[in-house]
């Protein structure tokens, strides 16, 4: 470790101890050397004894800075790792930091645009940022080419070395977790950090976010439910993104939405429909749909439309994952726990040798109490959480795409019930899921698959004769090879039989000669000739094996 890393690690540990976070480690795991090390190098009393543990963890992460704040936000979605009182506190972490100098942002924009001054591309550039976060900040301007209002998102200068340094230390701490916590190995801390690293590094590349936004906008073009602002790719680079400026009501501002006459029931239901459309129709979903990234258009409040921003984190599911997920939901709400267990095994989410009966019993034990509530109050996100937590006891591997899905679903549910507390998520989602599953099977699905593949087969038609000829030639060559191998095996079998025959005769002659040499010395050279014949037979048998 470099001196800088040692200093930073020392500061991190002192911060954790000042908030009494050593309480997370069972006393039996704190050995005498560790205790001496703690009191000699890190004498730091808990200065926040009056606060609950979850709040202390949140405050410590806030003190450690942006990288740790975002790490805490990610951990808040992994409710399989923490009890609710800690996960709820981590969810309160706010990614708000002081803005960096607008002049620096202006310099970065000019560097990204080939060294030309900002005024060559933009009018009314606002040096004061509109918003600021740990990774980037946003400035407003107008495009010189068409006068449209835009926002310019710029990555913080020199943020990458800071992120890499702190990630290296987070990895070090993650490797200590299995040694300090009894359940540490099951939590797979290194995998959790690796997942966070990928998400964070992806957020540093604004070209990726631009592509995500363009894709989502295309998927919901002319949709009455969701609007994604236009991105101007000619102005985008890894460190800068330019997109249409939008005006909307923050989805968390319920009072303003009601004052504007918004149809709250329809708005809440559309949030659910948008989510399931992204997941099951498009296989591409916005995975950071917390209230800060969602607005509602001022226009047509009786027919409300969402506006989504900040598309840095997206998720996708393959066709099999979508089918298993939809069938899991329907089987769960039908209380068919056997089907749920079988789907987990069939999907490969749990090992194929899993005992289905035991797994079914475990799912029933955990999930049956959920139905004590009315269906309208059951949370899809918590259903998934309960299923995944149970499956992890049966060695379910961490599925990053499903973790993202569960996190997003919790956001969608939270927003929906904040807007309209009577929202019946199951009633809204069930027709969509049943319709989607119906579309995946039967004759319509077969016809659709044929239509999708038809251009491919039309393109390959001229190549078919050659492909058939090649297949026949390869088949003939394969048959010739198989016949050759069969003949060699038969020949080896015959040689081995002959070898065993000669070795048996040789052994008999040698033993007979030895016996006669000892018991019948009057027979003269006869025993010697028998032994010599036996050795010759042995030699012939040995040669047959080669």
Curated annotation (Swiss-Prot):
Residues 124-502 form the Protein kinase domain. Belongs to the ABC1 family. UbiB subfamily. Keywords: ATP-binding, Cell inner membrane, Cell membrane, Kinase, Membrane, Nucleotide-binding, Transferase, Transmembrane, Transmembrane helix, Ubiquinone biosynthesis. It comes from Escherichia coli (strain SMS-3-5 / SECEC). The chain crosses the membrane at residues 501-521, 522-542. Is probably a protein kinase regulator of UbiI activity which is involved in aerobic coenzyme Q (ubiquinone) biosynthesis. It is a multi-pass membrane protein. Its EC number is 2.7.-.-. This is Probable protein kinase UbiB. The lineage of its organism: Bacteria, Pseudomonadati, Pseudomonadota, Gammaproteobacteria, Enterobacterales. GO terms for biological process: regulation of ubiquinone biosynthetic process; ubiquinone biosynthetic process. The gene is ubiB. One of its GO terms (cellular component) is plasma membrane.
């Amino acid at each position: 470790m470099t001196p800088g890393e040692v200093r930073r690690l020392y500061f991190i540990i002192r911060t954790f101890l000042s908030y009494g976070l050593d309480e997370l480690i069972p006393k039996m795991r704190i050995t005498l050397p560790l205790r001496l090390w703690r009191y000699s190098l890190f004498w730091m009393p808990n200065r926040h004894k009056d606060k609950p543990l979850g709040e202390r963890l949140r405050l410590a992460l806030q003190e450690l800075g942006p990288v740790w704040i975002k790490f805490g936000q990610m951990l808040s979605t992994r409710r399989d790792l923490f009890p609710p009182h800690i996960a709820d506190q981590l969810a309160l972490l706010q990614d708000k930091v002081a803005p960096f100098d607008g002049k620096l942002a202006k310099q970065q924009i000019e560097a990204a645009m080939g060294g030309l001054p900002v005024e060559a591309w933009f009018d009314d550039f606002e040096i004061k940022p509109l918003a600021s976060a740990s990774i980037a900040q946003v400035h407003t301007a107008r495009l010189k080419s068409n006068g449209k209002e835009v926002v310019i998102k710029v990555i913080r200068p020199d943020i990458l070395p800071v992120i890499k340094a702190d990630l290296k230390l987070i990895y070090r701490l993650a490797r200590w977790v299995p040694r300090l916590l009894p359940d540490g190995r099951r939590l797979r801390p290194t995998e959790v950090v690796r997942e966070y690293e990928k998400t964070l590094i992806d957020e540093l590349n604004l070209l990726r976010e631009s592509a995500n936004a363009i894709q989502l906008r295309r998927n919901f073009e002319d949709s009455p439910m969701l609007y994604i602002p236009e991105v101007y790719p000619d102005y985008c680079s890894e460190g800068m993104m330019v997109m249409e400026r939008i005006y909307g009501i923050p989805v968390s501002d319920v009072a303003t939405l009601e004052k504007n006459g918004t149809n709250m029931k329809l708005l809440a239901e559309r949030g659910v429909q948008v989510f399931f459309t992204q997941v099951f129709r498009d296989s591409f979903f916005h995975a950071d749909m917390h209230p800060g990234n969602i607005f509602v258009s001022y226009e047509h409040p009786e027919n409300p439309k969402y506006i989504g921003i900040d598309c840095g984190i997206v998720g996708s599911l393959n066709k099999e994952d979508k089918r298993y997920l939809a069938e899991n939901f329907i089987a769960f709400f039908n209380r068919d726990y056997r089907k749920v267990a079988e789907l987990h095994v069939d999907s490969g989410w749990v090992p194929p040798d899993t005992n289905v009966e035991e797994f079914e019993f475990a799912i029933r034990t955990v999930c049956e109490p959920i139905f004590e509530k009315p269906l309208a109050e059951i949370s899809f996100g918590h259903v998934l959480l309960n299923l995944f937590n149970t499956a992890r006891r049966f060695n379910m591997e961490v599925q990053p795409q499903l973790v993202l899905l569960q996190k997003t679903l919790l956001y969608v549910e939270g927003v929906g019930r904040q807007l309209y507390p009577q929202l019946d998520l199951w009633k809204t989602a069930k027709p969509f899921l049943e319709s989607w599953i119906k579309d995946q099977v039967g004759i319509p699905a077969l016809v659709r698959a044929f239509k999708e593949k038809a251009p491919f087969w039309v393109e390959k038609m001229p190549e078919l004769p050659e492909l058939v000829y090649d297949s026949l030639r390869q088949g003939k060559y394969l048959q010739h090879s198989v016949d050759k191998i069969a003949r060699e095996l038969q020949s080896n079998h015959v040689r081995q039989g002959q070898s065993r025959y000669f070795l048996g005769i040789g052994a008999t002659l040698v033993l007979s000669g030895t016996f006669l040499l000892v018991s019948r010395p009057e027979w003269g050279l006869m025993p010697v000739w028998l032994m010599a014949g036996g050795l010759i037979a042995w030699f012939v048998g040995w040669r047959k094996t080669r």
